[in-house]
């Protein structure tokens, strides 16, 4: 089990990591971005350079998220995610099992068809630690400077990169893999 720490997380996100480790008595492997790559990125683009363009934001996500993910998945046969179809238009067609050609592995999305209500019920029933930001209007939580609370009725991911236009607001972790059919 691993998670990504971009170096820009909310304190509540890190609290959730520690709470989860405590509840389940396990150590979650934390993958960090390469320090030299972050240093180069900030030196070239500035601390908030990701707000200048979609390409600049994607470059930041590449360094802080995608490359650490690639290192974590190196040699793995499968990857289990929490993607849900309800989260956004871009995720509306997520399959339970896919082949991810970028990672060369099977990607499993076991809660792909869960609604938010189903998820919340499962979490409450099983007393799973939850990021405190969810109760403050953050249905989707990423890096602190790239995430804001959403208004009631807004899309789950409307608070992510809100300064960008359009619906295709993904960081690059979840490409469009090929569905596995029986």
Which sequence ranges carry the predicted segments?
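Nucleotide-activated chemistry modules centered on ATP-dependent adenylation/adenylyltransferase
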Residues: 1-182
């Amino acid at each position: 089990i691993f998670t990504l720490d971009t170096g820009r997380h909310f304190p509540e996100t890190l609290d959730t990591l520690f709470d989860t480790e405590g509840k389940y008595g396990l150590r979650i492997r934390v993958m960090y971005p390469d320090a030299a790559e972050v240093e180069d990125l900030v030196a070239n683009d500035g601390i908030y350079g990701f707000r200048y363009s979609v390409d600049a934001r994607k470059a930041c996500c590449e360094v802080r998220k995608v490359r650490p993910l690639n290192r974590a998945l190196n040699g793995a046969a499968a990857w289990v995610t929490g993607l849900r179809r309800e989260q956004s238009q871009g995720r509306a067609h997520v399959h339970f099992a896919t082949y991810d050609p970028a990672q060369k592995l099977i990607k499993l999305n076991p809660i792909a068809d869960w609604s938010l209500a189903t998820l919340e019920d499962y979490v409450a029933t099983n007393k799973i630690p939850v990021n405190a930001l969810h109760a403050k209007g953050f249905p989707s939580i990423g890096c602190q400077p790239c995430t804001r609370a959403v208004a009631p009725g807004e899309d789950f991911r409307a608070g992510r990169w809100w300064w960008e236009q359009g619906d295709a607001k993904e960081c690059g972790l979840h490409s469009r893999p090929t569905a596995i059919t029986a």
